[in-house]
């Protein structure tokens, strides 16, 4: 988190969301005080006028600062929180590598693995969405293979330490 005076951080998130989980995990790793407001996106709570007034995209997570500033998109939140900490490298090359893996997660991993998790866990057995599973699983396996390939040569995704 950029060097700012200590402030109250409020996360509007859904506990079952992987994108919310990673924000919560970094907050815990950084030992930052925060308030969690559970927003059940599956029940439409991100589509209310009050929520949409703060986040027109109607998604979680949403980080709200005590001065009213709002930051959305999980990886933008992670970047802002990690800036200036050991969780985001200062060296430009390694910082770019961290961004590479954040982008990879959102564009190659999450669209297959998280969506497959949703289809399997939250849609009825007779849902037409079940037909997507073979394609999602294939894409998920490809994403995991890329990660596995990287980790065969490196202990961590970015840099020499955790």
Report the location of each language-model feature.
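Proteins with a high burden of low-complexity, intrinsically disordered sequence enriched in S/T/G/P/A and R
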Residues: 108, 160-162
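Amphipathic alpha-helical packing segments from all-alpha helical-bundle domains
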Residues: 132-151
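Surface-exposed helix-capping loop/turn segments at secondary-structure junctions
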Residues: 149-160
């Amino acid at each position: 988190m950029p060097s700012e005076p200590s402030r109250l951080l409020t996360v509007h998130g859904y506990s079952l969301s992987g994108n919310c989980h990673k924000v919560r995990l970094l907050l815990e790793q950084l030992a930052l005080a925060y308030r969690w407001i559970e927003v059940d996106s599956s029940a439409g709570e991100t589509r209310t006028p009050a929520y949409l007034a703060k986040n027109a995209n109607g998604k979680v997570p949403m980080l709200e600062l005590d001065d009213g500033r709002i930051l959305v998109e999980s990886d933008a939140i992670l970047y802002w929180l990690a800036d200036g900490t050991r969780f985001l490298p200062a060296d430009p090359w390694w910082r770019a590598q961290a961004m590479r893996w954040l982008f990879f997660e959102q564009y190659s991993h999450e669209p297959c693995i998280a969506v497959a998790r949703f289809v399997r866990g939250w849609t009825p057995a007779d849902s037409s969405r079940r037909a997507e599973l073979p394609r999602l699983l294939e894409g998920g396996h490809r994403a995991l293979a890329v990660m596995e390939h990287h980790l065969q040569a490196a202990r961590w995704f970015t840099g020499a330490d955790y």
